[in-house]
Design a protein with these regions (language model features):
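Extracytoplasmic
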Residues: 10, 19-42, 53-85, 90-131
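Active-site-flanking beta-strand signature of metal-NTP-handling nucleotidyl enzymes
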Residues: 44-49
Length: 131
């Protein structure tokens, strides 16, 4: 009985992660949403660019970018507060992500990019319901 309940809970958790709602505002801008990040292979990396506390500011940042398809936005919790994270690209290896981080387009702005494992991003995404 307990095993069946644990199996149901595990299935529900996987389903919730797989069925994250897409972020229509982000997709309308031509960028990627949390569901795209969740669909990427666990061994990969993305480049975290910037974190905003206001959704409108995060969307405005994406709007300013030329090639929005390279950008993704997701919501997570940081120190108990909702924040909006902008990341750039998906890379199969850390070395590929490091090389891309060193060559970011000028419109990204003066930032300190963080090469972040996709597994870590997926954990952050699962901490809060996406819009």
């Amino acid at each position: 009985m307990a095993s069946e309940e644990a199996d149901r809970e595990a299935q529900a958790a996987r389903a919730n992660l797989a069925d994250l709602p897409t972020d229509a505002d982000v997709q309308e801008l031509g960028a990627r949403s949390a569901s795209w990040l969740v669909a990427q292979a666990d061994g990969g990396y993305t480049i975290q660019l910037i974190v905003y506390t206001e959704r409108s500011a995060a969307l405005a940042y994406v709007r300013r970018q030329k090639n929005r398809r390279d950008f993704a936005m997701f919501k997570t919790l940081s120190q108990g507060r909702t924040v909006y994270v902008i990341s750039y690209g998906y890379y199969a290896s850390q070395s590929a992500a490091d090389a891309a981080a060193a060559e970011l387009p000028a419109e990204v702005g003066r930032i300190e990019p963080w090469v972040r494992p996709i597994g870590s991003v997926k954990t952050a995404i699962s901490s809060i319901a996406q819009d």
